[in-house]
Regions:
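A conserved hydrophobic secondary-structure block that centers on an alpha-helix together
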Residues: 1-13
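His/Asp/Glu-enriched short active-site or ligand-binding loop at hydrolase and phosphoryl-transfer sites
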Residues: 18-31, 155-160
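Short acidic/polar capping segments at secondary-structure boundaries
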Residues: 3-5, 27, 53-55
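Active-site and substrate-binding clefts of carbohydrate-active enzymes
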Residues: 33-279
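Short alpha-helical segments and helix-capping/turn motifs at coil-helix boundaries
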Residues: 5-8, 31-37
Length: 279
């Protein structure tokens, strides 16, 4: 799944030239632990930057900034699909929402300054679709955060720059698999509710691995089958039987391609163009 990590990936990441990854270790270290502010060095691979869930929750969590009353309600439509309601059900006022975004930006920067008062790096990593999509005023909020950071004296940096000034400590032994998803683990993609998706993808992976020189088409069908969206949609019951249908179609297409390479029209040739000639 996206944004997932397991220690056994370290050597592969190292070979791929990945210097650093952002990981979710809240379950291992505890919410708000100061250990989240220091990079960790894995034994066999890249630098681990720990996303700071306590700060991320200010914008991403239940009751975070986007839920405040003046903001535009993403889910409330008129007959003609216009969004004209605030979160609290009142009539939307863009001026008031902009004012709220600036106030929330000032509050956010103040919270981060307090978080790193004694040093360290706060990694605020989110799905950027939140900004401007789910949270209409999110882009204005981010713009105001940049202004507030300058005004309040909060240094903004990139991870490449930060690694030059922050010494990494060894990662704790025994880290398991983690993700940015529900529960900080892999339950959304391999829990009992979606076990069939996980087993089907694994069986397909083994079948392809046992095939000498599999075609590019076969590799692409496997990638499409392994898409984390199918299990996610099924686990959250967001799209009826569509994810099951899509996963099954890719599994069947892969099986046909392994049996009779090149005999069937490909509908995934645009996926992962870098695979051309890989095998």
């Amino acid at each position: 799944p996206e944004c997932a990590y397991a220690p056994w990936l370290d050597p592969a990441l190292e070979r791929a030239g990945v210097r650093a990854v952002c990981v979710e270790l809240t379950n291992a270290l505890g919410l708000g632990s100061e250990r989240h502010l220091q990079p960790m060095r894995s034994a066999d691979g890249p630098l681990l930057w720990l996303i700071d869930r306590a700060v991320i929750a200010l914008a991403w969590g239940q009751g975070g900034y986007p839920s405040r009353p003046p903001y535009r309600d993403y889910h409330a439509y008129t007959t003609h699909r216009h969004r004209v309601r605030r979160i609290d059900g009142g009539r939307y006022d863009h001026v008031a929402a902009t004012r709220q975004a600036r106030a929330d930006a000032a509050e956010f920067v103040s919270a981060v300054r307090a978080r790193v008062r004694d040093g360290g790096v706060c990694v605020f990593a989110i799905d950027t679709e939140l900004l401007g999509h789910w949270w209409y005023e999110g882009v204005q909020w981010l713009d105001a955060v940049l202004d507030e950071a300058d005004r309040q004296g909060l240094a903004l940096t990139t991870l490449d720059a930060a690694r030059e000034h922050h010494e990494a400590v060894p990662a704790p032994a025994g880290l398991g698999s983690t993700s940015w998803g529900e529960g900080g683990d892999l339950r959304t993609w391999s829990g009992p509710k979606v076990a069939a998706f996980a087993w089907r993808a694994r069986a397909a992976e083994l079948a392809l691995a046992a095939t000498p020189n599999p075609s590019d088409r076969a590799l692409r069908e496997l990638l499409a089958l392994q898409s984390s969206d199918w299990a996610f949609l099924a686990d959250w019951e967001l799209a009826g039987d569509y994810p099951e249908q899509r996963a099954q179609l890719h599994a069947e297409a892969l099986a046909r391609e392994l049996r009779d390479p090149g005999a069937h029209e490909s509908k995934v040739r645009g996926l992962a163009p870098w695979l051309a000639g890989w095998s």
